[in-house]
A protein has these predicted regions:
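Compact, glycine-rich, soluble single-domain proteins
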Residues: 1-105
Length: 105
């Protein structure tokens, strides 16, 4: 698991087509913007057929310890809320590149 600290609207890039960023950081809940063209997105448990988003864009509220599943192999976990920032853990296969947006240029 790669752990990154992000502030509101700071993007994490996963692979070539996935972007996730905390939009609103509250004291106990964070709203994430998830853009994942071509990947099903689920709220934290493996979805039943037809139960996940297929359009690739979601706004999801997560509490500490809750997950967002992207495709079959990528898991994003809200680990901690630290005032105006969050610690996010990303678990992905070793061949999938994970970058902070500011390093991608």
């Amino acid at each position: 698991m790669l752990v990154l600290t992000r502030r509101s609207h700071q993007v994490i890039l996963i692979g070539d087509n996935i972007e996730i960023a905390p939009d609103r950081i509250g004291t106990s809940v964070v709203k994430f913007s998830v853009r994942a063209s071509g990947y099903p997105i689920a709220r934290g448990e493996r979805p039943a057929a037809g139960d996940a988003s297929k359009d690739g864009v979601l706004i999801l509220a997560r509490k500490c310890g809750e997950q967002i599943l992207i495709g079959d192999h990528i898991v994003v976990t809200l680990l901690r809320i630290c005032g105006s920032c969050v610690k996010v853990g990303v678990t992905a296969p070793p061949e999938v590149r994970i970058l902070r947006d500011e390093l991608a240029a």
